[in-house]
């Protein structure tokens, strides 16, 4: 059964959106979601794009989706998340809840993400069912795990700072010695925007992290002037577009 929360009007100040009413459903059925995206023209409808996560990135997709005549659906944890406040199609559920994610995925044509923290095992299971996942779990793992990312970039020959896998005090001591005693230490998973990152000049600086027993990524400190992000898009057919910095 579907559980509907009170309708919510989109604030008119949100760029690129029209005044609309959002209907929230729990992640246990998809009948309402399927019917709600049907076009007024019999048999025709806009493609349904499902975004797992209701944060700022999902919210920024909404105006672009409207311009492209795409029907954007959002799986949000709560109605208070950024994208959930302005989307017309919101299903409530956690990104790591198999039942919620599966129900959501079955209600859309393609699944994508607001963040990288969806379990890849769950995504592999969805792909096995025939769900289209973009990017797929084999690519998403490199956004989830910094150690996997560094290993893959190094394997491909891309320039990287010197880096070390750290699991023990001995690992960190060796990395400190090789780097000259000045490292940036990062959690392999879960860090973002300054969280899960610390500067380490001695073993004691990182003892608490080492005691957690989780793999860490140590990198040499790199002097830099600025940080740039390059956006690249790829269609399933192989066409690639790069956007100017």
Predicted feature residues:
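Generic detection of intrinsically disordered/low-complexity segments and helix-coil linkers/edges
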Residues: 3, 17-18, 157, 237
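Generic alpha-helix initiation/capping and coil-helix boundary signal
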Residues: 12-15, 58, 199
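Compositionally biased, low-complexity flexible segments
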Residues: 7-8, 12-19
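Active-site nucleotide/adenylate-binding loops and adjacent lid/helix of ATP-dependent enzymes
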Residues: 142-245
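Residue-level detector of intrinsically disordered/flexible regions characterized by low predicted structural confidence
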Residues: 10-11, 26-27, 33, 37, ...
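ATP-binding N-terminal substructure of ATP-dependent carboxylate-amine bond-forming enzymes
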Residues: 1-2, 6, 23-151, 155, ...
């Amino acid at each position: 059964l579907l559980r509907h929360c009170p309708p919510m009007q989109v604030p008119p100040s949100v760029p690129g959106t029209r005044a609309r009413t959002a209907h929230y459903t729990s992640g246990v059925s998809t009948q309402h979601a399927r019917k709600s995206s049907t076009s007024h023209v019999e048999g025709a409808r806009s493609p349904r794009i499902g975004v797992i996560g209701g944060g700022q990135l999902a919210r920024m997709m909404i105006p672009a989706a409207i311009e492209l005549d795409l029907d954007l659906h959002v799986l949000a944890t709560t109605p208070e998340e950024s994208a959930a406040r302005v989307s017309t199609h919101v299903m409530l559920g956690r990104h790591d809840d198999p039942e919620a994610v599966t129900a959501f995925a079955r209600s859309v044509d393609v699944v994508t993400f607001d963040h990288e923290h969806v379990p890849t095992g769950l995504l592999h299971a969805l792909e096995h069912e025939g769900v289209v996942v973009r990017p797929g779990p084999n690519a998403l793992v490199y956004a989830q795990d910094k150690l996997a990312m560094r290993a893959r970039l190094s394997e491909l020959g891309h320039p990287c700072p010197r880096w070390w896998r750290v699991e023990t005090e001995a690992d960190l001591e060796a990395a400190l010695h090789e780097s000259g005693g000045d490292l940036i230490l990062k959690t392999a998973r879960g860090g973002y925007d300054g969280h899960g990152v610390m500067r380490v000049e001695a073993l004691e600086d990182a003892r608490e992290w080492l005691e957690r027993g989780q793999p860490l990524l140590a990198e040499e400190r790199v002097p830099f002037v600025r940080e740039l992000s390059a956006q690249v898009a790829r269609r399933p057919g192989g066409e690639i577009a790069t956007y100017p910095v």
